[in-house]
Amino acid sequence: MARDLIIKALTEAVANAKRAGDLPPGVTAAVELQTPRDPRHGDVSTSLALVLASEVGGPARQIAEKLLRHLELPRDAVDKVEVAGAGFINFTFSPQWLRAVLRLIAEQRDEYGSTDVGGGKSLLLEFVSANPTGPVAVVQGRAAAIGDTLAKLFARTGWNVSREYYVNDALNSTQIQRFAETLEARYLQQFGKKVAIPEDGYQGDYVVDMAQELISSEGDRYLKMAQEERLAAFYEYSLKKIVAGHQRDMEAFGVRFDTWFFESLLYERNEVEAALEALKVGGYTYEADGALWLKATELGDEQDQVLVRKDGRPGYLAADIAYHKNKFDRGFDRLIDIWGPDHQGHVRRTKAGVQALGYDPSRFEILIHQIVRLFRGSEMVRMSKRAGDIVPLAGLLDDVGADAARFFFLMQSMESHLDFDLELAKKQAQDNPVYYVQYAHARISSILREAQDRGVALPVPDVSAVNLNRLEHPDELALIRKLAELPDEIRDAAERYEPHRMTRYAREVASVFHSFYTNCRVLGDDAELTAARLTLVQAAQTVLRIVLDTIGVSAPEKM
C-alpha cells in the first residue's frame, strides 16, 4: 500500500541524509504517519522532522526540506509532497493509485485489508470470564464486544487467534461458597423457614428464581440433608446453572469461545501446586504469619502478595499464576487478557508471578476496560432489584438488540467510561450511529438491485475493463481515499488495542458515501460512467461489510 511505500521511503531518506552529512550519524526516529483531519493537508502526514529536530536541534522545517532532498517515491503512488506548518511533511496520493485501490478491492473482496503482520503466530485472547455467581453484566458485555472484535482484528492481521473464557469454579472459591449459602437461605425461605441471607450474600431476585426452579425440579428433598451436604449440592447446581446462562448470553451476543477453561482443572491436575513449587524453587516465596507469600515487590508490585492463606487454602493469586503458566505451556506465542475496571490492582501481581516463573513478560498483556452507564435520554438507569447490584447483559439485548449493543460498546476507547444512550440505540434515524452505518450498506444494496433490474451484470465481471479514469468528481475521489484507509485502520486497531477505531471508521465511510450518493448519480445514461461508479459502490459495500463483520454487527440489505 502507498502508506508502506512512504514509510519505507522516509526511512531510507533518513539513512541517506545521515550518509550525506545532513543529519548526525547517531540520530534515530521511528516513522509514523497520520491522516490529517483537513483533506487540504494531504492524505497522510508525518511529524518525523519535528521528532528529529527535538534530537538534533534546529528548525524542523529545515530538517523536513533536507529529508525531501533524499526522498524517492514512485510517481504512480504519490502525486504531491510538501512541507507545511512547523515542519510537517504532507503527502497526497495520485488519482491513478487511488483508482487502483478499487481494482484491489474487487480482486481481494472480503480479504481486502487483511495482512500477514502476525506471520501465523498463535495468540490466546481471554476475556469476559465473569464470576459464576450471577448473570453476565452489561459491563462484561463491553468486554465481550472488545475481546471479540480484537480477536477478529488480530485474525485479519495474520495471527492464529484462540478465544478463551475462564470459569472460577474452584471448590475453595469464597464467592461461589457465599452464593451457595445465599441460595440455601432462599431455598429454605420458600418453605417458611426464618433464615437470613448472609450479610455479604447476593441480593438479586434471580437467586429467588433459582431457588424456586430448584424446588420445581427437586422438591423438598434438600431439607432432610445435613447442611454441609446441602451446600455442596447447591454449589454444584448453581455453578452449572449460571455457567449455562453465561454460555447462552455469549451465544445471543454472537461471541463464541474456542475454550471454556475451568479453574477446577488446575487443582485436579495439581497445576496450582506445581506452580507454587516452581516459585519456591526460584526463590520468589517466603513464609510469614503462617502464610506463603510471593516476593512481588522484587518484581515491580507495590507490596508482597499472599499465595497460600494461613488455613492452607491457596489464594486467588496462586490459581491465577498457575492458569497463566498453563497458557504459556500450551505453546501460545502471545497472551492477552481483558479485565474489568475492578481488577486494576491485580495487574502487577499477576505479571509478577508470570515473570517469576521465567516467562517473557513482553509476551503477556493485560488490558483494562472501564465502566458502562446506561441512560434513557438524560436520566441514568438504576440497578434493578431482580438483578441485585448489576444490570444484566441479557436485558440490554432484549431492549436494544445485539447490533446496537456491540456498536455502542465500541464507540469509545476501552480506557474511557462509556455512557450508553438506550433511546438513541433504538432510534430508526441517522443520528443513531449504528443505524446510519447499516443504512449506508442497505442503500448500496438497493442501488445494486436496481442495477440488476436494469440488466447490469453484477458484480462487475471484469473491473480491469472498466474505465476508472471517469471517476474524477471530488466526492468520488474522497470515497476512494476513505476506502483505501481500511488496511491501516485494521492494523492500527489491532496493534494499539483500539477496536473503537473500527466504529469511527465505519461512520466515516458511511458519511463519505452518503455525500457521494447525494452528489453523484450512480445509474445514469452514460454507460461508461455508470460502470465506474458501480465499481466504486461495490467497493464501498465490501469495505462496510468487512468492518461490520469485524465488530460483530449485521450488514442488512434492506431497512
What is each model feature region?
Residues M1-R99, A106, D110, S114-M559:
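Non-catalytic interaction-recognition regions
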